[in-house]
Structures are given as C-alpha cells and as structure tokens.
From Swiss-Prot:
Task performed by this protein: Catalyzes the reversible phosphorylation of UMP to UDP.
Regulation (activators, inhibitors): Inhibited by UTP.
Gene Ontology CC annotation, any one: cytoplasm
Quaternary organization: Homohexamer.
Magnesium is among the record's keywords: no
UniProt record similarity statement: Belongs to the UMP kinase family.
InterPro entries recorded: AceGlu_kinase-like_sf, Asp/Glu/Uridylate_kinase, Uridylate_kinase, Uridylate_kinase_bac
Protein name in UniProt: Uridylate kinase
Length: 248
C-alpha cells in the first residue's frame, strides 16, 4: 500500500543554519542537496510545497543593529541574505528534477519573480516548489513572521518549522536536565510562557488564522517525510487548549 500524505499543501520554514557551512556560516552545498532530497521525497507524495528560508548563516540583521548599523538597513541586508539562500535551495532542488520558483518580496527581477499571491498559488497548483525570499519586504519583521504570513496567504494546511532540536521544551534542554518536551501546546501558552518558538507577531498571526505549526528536527534524516505522512514527531502548536508533555 502506497504511503499517503496527511497534508495537501505545506510551508516549510528553514533557518539559515540548515544550510550553514563550517562555523555555522556560509552555504554548505551538501546540506542544500540533502534538504532537496528530503523535499523531493515529500513532493513525490503529491504534496504542494512552499519554503521560507532565513539568512542567519550569512547575515543577522539584529546583530548588525547591535553593532551600530541602522536597524532598518541591517534588516534589509538580512533580507538580501535570504535571497542568496533561496537561490542555493532552488539550484539544489532543480538538480533533483523539481520545478522551482523563487518569489522575492524585494524586487530583483533578473534573478527572482516578485511576490504575487495569485501567481504563487498557481505555481503550487502546478506542483512547483515555491521559495519565498526577501522576508516580508519590510524591516522589523522576522522570517518566522514571513512564514506565517505566506502560509496564511497561499492557504497552507500547516507550517513545518525545521530546527536543530526535536521540539519545544519546558526549558533549554542543554542547560536543564529536567527539561521536558511538549508534544502539544497552544499558541497562547507558547506566548505566555515565552518559549521562543517564534516571535509573538508570527504566533499571533497563526493563532488568529488557525494555522498550526509543528516544530521538528530537520537534521534527522526522514523526519520531514514522517511528519507529512502523519507520524507524531516534534511539537504541535495550535489553538487547542490541550497541553501534552511526553517526558522526553
């Protein structure tokens, strides 16, 4: 019996570190190709896939702002970094035979389409991978907020937030041996407990539009496909008030 996908259309939020090379800087092409392979496995199930990628492996706008660069300027620099990452992912995906489009919130027409919601939806319907770059196009907004906004705009079923940890914990598991992992928690509890899943703007947008988020470990091979086919992996964040801790 063929494996069936639980979702029809998903948005995968990748941090820049998912592509990072040595010292968590730059782009490791091996990581890009590994991600592309996992994306293809999910695409082959018939799932429509959108991506948002951060730029922290190249530039972190908040760090530049702390170093004295004007915050808006620093954020624009960070947005340009996301475009570089998007192009790297596009190249890797196309080498796996996937049709891909990069849509940027900042006009850069020689290398990416401008973001147009209807066009993005049409690409997804035609089974193209759509990579959203350039953030929201405005400073002071994170790429997590971009992911929330785009997922709502193009009608995704869920946001899969790919991280280096296997879910959301009651405390930092690297610092607290007693930290336990949530298997499920509500948006409001995430905000109230300051669990740093996403910034409050991103979480509020998801909460208001009933857009569930699953936080999972992207570095464990097979997790992405397992999630999409319905396995209980990571932490589900939704409007459900039911809080579950798995004790891990």
């Amino acid at each position: 019996m063929a494996t069936e996908a639980k979702y029809n259309r998903i948005l995968i939020k990748l941090s820049g570190e998912a592509l990072a090379g040595e010292g968590e800087f730059g782009i490791d092409t091996n990581k890009a190709h590994s991600l592309a392979e996992e994306i293809k496995e999910v695409h082959d199930l018939g799932v429509e896939i959108a991506l948002v990628v951060g730029g922290g492996n190249i530039i972190r706008g908040t760090n530049l702002a702390k170093a004295g660069i004007d915050r808006a300027t620093a954020d624009y620099m960070g947005m340009l970094a996301t475009i570089q990452n998007a192009l790297a992912l596009q190249d890797a995906c196309e080498k796996k035979g996937l049709y891909t489009r990069v849509q940027s919130a900042i006009e850069i027409n020689s290398i990416a389409e401008s973001y147009i919601r209807r066009r993005a939806v049409r690409h997804l319907e035609k089974r193209r991978i759509v990579i959203f770059a350039g953030g929201t196009g405005n400073p002071y907004f994170t790429t997590d907020t971009t992911a929330s906004l785009r997922a709502v705009e193009v009608g995704c079923d869920v946001i899969l937030k790919a991280t280096k940890v296997d879910g959301v914990y009651t405390a930092d598991p690297k610092k607290d041996n007693g930290a336990k992992r949530y298997s499920q928690i509500s948006f409001m509890e995430s905000i109230n407990r300051r669990l740093k899943v996403m910034d409050s703007t991103a979480l509020s947008l998801c909460m208001e539009n009933n857009m569930s988020i699953i936080v999972f470990d992207i570095f464990k091979r097979g997790n992405l496909k397992d999630l999409v086919t319905g396995k209980n992996i990571g932490t589900l964040i939704s409007n459900s008030e039911d809080i579950q801790i798995d004790g891990k």
